[in-house]
Structure formats: C-alpha cells, structure tokens
C-alpha cells in the first residue's frame, strides 16, 4: 500500500513486514509516477512500543549497530549522535538520536542510523510509533525529506 507524507506526494513509501531477528519492517521510498519504480531510499525498522523502556532499549540497540557500522565503514565521515528535538513536532516533545555515515562531503548521500521517540501530542495526531531505523537515502530523496515532506 502506498503511503504519502503530510505535505508532499512527490515520493511514496511502501512498508513490508519482515519479522527477522534484525528488523520488523523494511520500508522503501519511490518517486511518485516513476514507471521504473527506482528505489530512492530503503530502511530496516525496529519498533519500540513500550514507552517506559524505549529510550534505554533504543540506545542499547543504536550503540550496537553503530559499533558494527563504524568498524565496517571507517572510511566514511561519521557524525556524532546527540539527542535532538524532532523539528516536525512543533510542541518540542519528540526527540531523535541520529548518526550519519556520509558518502560525500555534501551530506546528501548517506546511511542513516536513527531512533525517534514521539511526544504524546504528536503520537495522538499521527499514530507514529517510537522506532529505530537504519537506511540509505539517495540525494534526491534526502533533499525532499528535509525540505518538502513536512512543510
């Protein structure tokens, strides 16, 4: 099933059940009306449904994946993880921890390891679940996500 973002239909996402030991879901992003269905972003997702343990479990899994990726991708520029407010949530009650493994100096093509914890108002509005995501984004998709998807 195609799902669109709140402010733009330039890309859509399809989420597939995966249920492996590593990820619950696999998410693909494709440019709308692309007759070749070229994947612009692909992510593995783990959901954390228990708010009482989310942050602790997030950080444990986040650190484990980061350790593995950092040793495998040591030639890439790797950002430091910090707890930051999720810009899309205007209440300021949603947070994310994100690390970027950049393929170029422009920061436009990268692997992204992130955890998102939603505030109660944002959760009630969109029904998004706290999650960890490991994904690769193309340059075009990255630009769209940062500048158009949540305007």
Q: How does the language model describe each region?
A:
Residues 5-6, 17, 52, 95, ...:
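Generic detection of intrinsically disordered/low-complexity segments and helix-coil linkers/edges
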Residues 20-94:
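Long, charged/polar, surface-exposed segments that mediate recognition or autoinhibition
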Residues 60-140:
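A charged, solvent-exposed segment within the mature domains of Sec-exported extracytoplasmic proteins
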Residues 1-38, 150-151:
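N-terminal leader/targeting segments
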Residues 15-16, 27, 107, 140, ...:
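Prokaryotic Sec-type signal peptides and long signal-anchor helices
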Residues 2-3, 9-10, 21, 35, ...:
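Intrinsically disordered, low-complexity segments enriched in small/polar residues
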Residues 55-57, 125-130, 146-150:
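Surface-exposed beta-strand edges and their flanking turn/coil or helix-capping segments
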Residues 135-136, 144-148:
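Soluble, non-transmembrane alpha-helical interaction regions
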